[in-house]
């Protein structure tokens, strides 16, 4: 048996004045068929009333308790852009920013500079005291920063003043440990070095000539210590892959040892990359036991408050599911369809409203639910579960769960 | 958006031989309409199978884990009667009792003595070693006792022999700590001092003349160390009030920083203080973001095993809800209607039977439930939740929940 967890990012919603949601109104014959043939319920990826980020939500869906494994966004972002992080590393997300000689930020994104690979070289591989600096640009003004060395801590403040016209913040330790003090000192030294190396760099001299904002500073935030995470295969016995568009989800996948499959296009149908992803899922299942799929789009529509677009994205996902369910065998694959969090149109942000979930496959206890939406699935046999319950339920159905006791 | 948590104390019940409960039989058109317009479920204020006190239940409903914040009844009672307690204080409830010269209790409530303010003065403000004694009578034979000083502990036994004819118990430490030993010694010294000061007090000499039991001893029980509790406003961002009749609930409210609103009467309708409370709720909502309401009566009827009275109280509460829902806007106020625990007629005490709960307001996922009772709401979209889930769900609906992750 194999398994797929299919995450429609931002899927859930709150009813509008007419009691409708994009998912309720969307034409989703395949989702509804899966609801009819499967076992349904509600799910909060983290917990009831907890408004999750995509990162904490996906960790939970993969069976990891986010409260012990999620140390901050930095480690997962760094992992996502290809840094091979190690437990104990201190990782940050960074912006290249423009600052004046007093470190006052004049442009947080350095004029959305597009190519920072030459600037990256100035910082990557530096050594400050006994700490190695790993620095990788991740497309334009964004970058990941990793500190590797003995006696470091993530109990430090970040540098981001959040607003232009404010000074890049000095890093301070958040506790009395010598590790926090040392880490804060290293980052403060690094920021000075970064300014010295970047301000007069030819890339920036050229930008000055063109009246473009210079990328003469890095501003780290989202600090976290890379956690010790038991790898997915060791934990589950499954060879796992991840198909996702966003770097953060890829980072989570890499952190737990899933192979990230990049999808470029595929001859299933001509219709956008949704179908390319559907093809990739079917193909990847030939070589893997497990796939975590994330489909963005509904979340973005939610963040934009665009009801119609969210509905359309959900309908496209339904087409993906049509292709997938026609090309996999219910006797061989367990399929979990849900989201990572709701992104209600009225909130334009993540919410804690629970998600509909369906578990489809051989030998599940089919319930009476006949429609996949926020108003039907709560009556199903899965009741109201948490994200961390999904993997144990799947492993049990697959005959892979360890017995607890005798 | 604002929010009300409306607690009908002791609301739930077990079915009688005909399968009825006071709530099921009561005519409650407003509760039923709220169930129809809202999202329903079952709730255990503390946890499934846990038989809660009103104190632990209300802490949970306010979003505080009772297992970490509830240290005993003493601190909340003391707070409720107006002692400004501080984290670390050791607090007790006390009775004034009558004892003989060997400390054998002859009347646990000192003949239900009505005025103890003169006796209070003998004890309040004493200093024993480095510990300050704060003592406040709280109406008749009841009082609150607080010890304030360095190195104290609540790991001690209490003094209450529970029966007349038994000796006031010596206090013993419950662990090997020097704090517990010190605290036990202080209380033992205090009891001796209390007897010395009270036994010959003019108030008691006068009672002896009138053949009334003397209030010549205090008997502390319900010890607890005042916990560090994050204040409600800091935790939630909401300016909160509490409308409740009983001192214990007021104490909980004060402990978490809610303003306690005392209701004396109100010109809404002439019909008892139920309607006065209903008016006060509507008025208080003008100046506050959040109100915790507790309506006693159903609980008392349950403790008395009085089915008809419990039903009548519930019908009066329905009239309150009629007034309230007509005078607030569903677009501005989230309203949670439930109880703190069941008080079944057959038990005449609190039980762990879960409570019906409805969450009424804008943008909730309305379910199919059409009646508010123990037999209908479990089919609703809220499923079976715990008391500590209520505040996170409300804060999420109000757009005030913090995101966990990115």
Swiss-Prot record, chains A, B:
Its EC number is 5.4.2.12. Pathway: Carbohydrate degradation; glycolysis; pyruvate from D-glyceraldehyde 3-phosphate: step 3/5. InterPro entries: Alkaline_phosphatase_core_sf, ApgAM_prokaryotes, Metalloenzyme, Pglycerate_mutase_ApgM. GO terms for biological process: glycolytic process. It holds the Pfam family PhosphMutase. Keywords: Glycolysis, Isomerase. It is an enzyme of class 5 (isomerase). It catalyses: (2R)-2-phosphoglycerate = (2R)-3-phosphoglycerate. One of its GO terms (molecular function) is metal ion binding. CDD domains: iPGM_like. Catalyzes the interconversion of 2-phosphoglycerate and 3-phosphoglycerate. Belongs to the BPG-independent phosphoglycerate mutase family. A-PGAM subfamily. This is 2,3-bisphosphoglycerate-independent phosphoglycerate mutase.
């Amino acid at each position: 048996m194999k398994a797929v967890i299919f995450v429609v990012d931002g899927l859930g919603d709150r009813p509008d004045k007419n009691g409708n949601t994009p998912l309720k109104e969307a034409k989703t014959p395949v989702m509804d068929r899966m609801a009819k043939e499967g076992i349904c319920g509600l799910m909060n990826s983290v917990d009831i009333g907890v408004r999750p980020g995509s990162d904490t939500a996906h960790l939970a869906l993969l069976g990891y308790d986010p409260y012990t494994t999620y140390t901050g966004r930095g480690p997962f972002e760094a992992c996502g852009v290809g840094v091979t992080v190690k437990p104990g590393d201190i990782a940050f997300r960074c912006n290249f920013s423009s600052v004046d000689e007093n470190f006052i930020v004049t442009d947080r994104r350095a004029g959305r500079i597009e190519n920072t690979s030459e600037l990256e070289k100035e910082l990557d591989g530096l050594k400050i005291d006994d700490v190695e600096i790993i620095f990788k640009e991740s497309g334009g003004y964004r970058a990941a920063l990793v500190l590797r060395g003995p006696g470091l801590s993530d109990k430090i403040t970040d540098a981001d003043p959040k607003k232009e016209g404010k000074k890049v913040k000095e890093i301070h330790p958040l506790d009395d440990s010598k590790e926090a003090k040392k880490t804060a000192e290293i980052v403060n030294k690094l920021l000075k070095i970064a300014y010295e190396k970047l301000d007069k760099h030819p890339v920036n001299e050229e930008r000055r000539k063109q009246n473009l904002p210079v990328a003469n500073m890095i501003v780290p935030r989202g600090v976290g210590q890379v956690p010790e995470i038991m790898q997915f295969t060791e934990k589950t016995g499954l060879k796992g892959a991840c198909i996702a568009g966003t770097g953060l989800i890829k980072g989570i996948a890499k952190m737990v040892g899933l192979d990230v499959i990049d999808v470029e296009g595929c001859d299933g149908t001509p219709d956008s990359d949704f179908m390319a992803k559907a093809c990739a899922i079917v193909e990847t299942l030939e070589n893997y036991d497990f796939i975590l799929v994330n489909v963005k789009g509904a979340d973005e529509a939610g963040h934009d408050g665009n009801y119609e677009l969210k509905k359309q994205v959900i309908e496209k996902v339904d087409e993906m599911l049509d292709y997938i369910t026609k090309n996999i065998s219910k006797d061989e694959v367990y399929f979990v369809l849900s989201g990572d969090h709701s992104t209600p149109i009225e909130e334009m942000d993540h919410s804690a409203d629970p998600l509909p979930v369906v578990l489809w496959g051989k030998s599940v206890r089919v319930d009476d639910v006949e429609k996949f939406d926020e108003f039907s699935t709560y009556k199903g046999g899965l009741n109201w579960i948490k994200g961390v319950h999904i993997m144990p339920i799947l492993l049990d159905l697959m005959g892979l769960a360890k017995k607890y006791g005798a």
